[in-house]
């Protein structure tokens, strides 16, 4: 397959053609997140709390997989743009070996720490028991999760977005179908409760791996995975981690943020912890859609950067920013229009619904301006400037928001914590523009 279309096709149609499959995939994936949480919420509010507390650890596992995949994607795209397909293949082969190593380490580590982690944020034995039961199954599928994301990034790097869309959508649909069947024991299926939710998720991750492997075999791509490249491509390991580690930290920071916010909010009420968990499920519908656009942008911007098309790189950034802003504006409108109805999908507790409605109206004030940070961070990753991207994520997830949340909680209680989100987005957007411009000028 000839990837030169990434520097020859007009930018807007190219970006739409690359991003649209990912946006559709992300929308389906977001729907899965919401549906999955909806079914877990039907078990009990304790089950929803357990899921919320396990989420940061799950997010960390995903962060390692996606972050390393972003580094892999950037390196492959760069070498394809430079016309060096062998180096791209070496990167892909090294990436697969390292992905499997990461999976083994994270499986063992997650299973060892999860109970102690849960006890840091809850004294309820019911919640802890539910969280451990869920975790013991979900983390056994870590190798499938990481293999899934590895192949996704490789196919994206060569512009095969429809393949990744197909894999993601089928996996999500399988998950959505299995959720009610094995959570509640419908028909011949056993009633597994919260373990059923974990099993459905795991099977949903295995499915696209099988699809990707079959497509890789029957419709070969220009990037080859070969055993001999393990030896030849050793010099690329450092480059993969140079981009991948900052990207991993970028994506892992929300885990730290959620855990820290859980600690701040738990002082006031367990309902605040539930609301935070629900918010992060809902916001995936908006942010994953914007991330779909950014994923479509990364291989294009990396390819053009490798090909020396710097004016085109700037245009790609600007159009991506506008597209992300439109998505965030739509998300803001929805959250302001029906905040309590959205929270009501996951809880019947009047206090949780009331607090959740307040949270959504306050947090959504920062959605639109966050498009600047999202686009800048993604563009920098695509350009191979992971360190600069990390600065933006540190501002959004640690440096600004945690002190703001802590101070605001002491000024006005748990409800004031939600203001920290939009304040952070405004400050981070300004920092993002400065960081991006300086990084690109170097």
Q: Locations of the language-model features?
A:
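Transmembrane helical elements of multi-pass membrane transporters/channels
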Residues: 17-36, 137, 171, 204-208, ...
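Structural signal for membrane-spanning alpha-helices in multi-pass inner-membrane proteins
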Residues: 110, 153, 179, 183, ...
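Short runs within selected transmembrane alpha-helices of multi-pass transporters and secretion channels
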Residues: 69, 73, 138-156, 164-172, ...
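Helix-terminus/linker motif at the lipid-water interface of multi-pass membrane proteins
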Residues: 27, 31-49, 118-125, 181-192, ...
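Hydrophobic transmembrane alpha-helices of multi-pass small-molecule transporters
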Residues: 60-63, 107, 175-180, 209-213, ...
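Small-residue-rich hydrophobic transmembrane alpha-helices
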Residues: 48-108, 145-164, 262, 275-339, ...
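Residue-level signal for short hydrophobic patches within transmembrane helices
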Residues: 8, 12-31, 35, 57-64, ...
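Short alpha-helical transmembrane segments in multi-pass integral membrane proteins
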Residues: 1-19, 76-143, 189-245, 301-366, ...
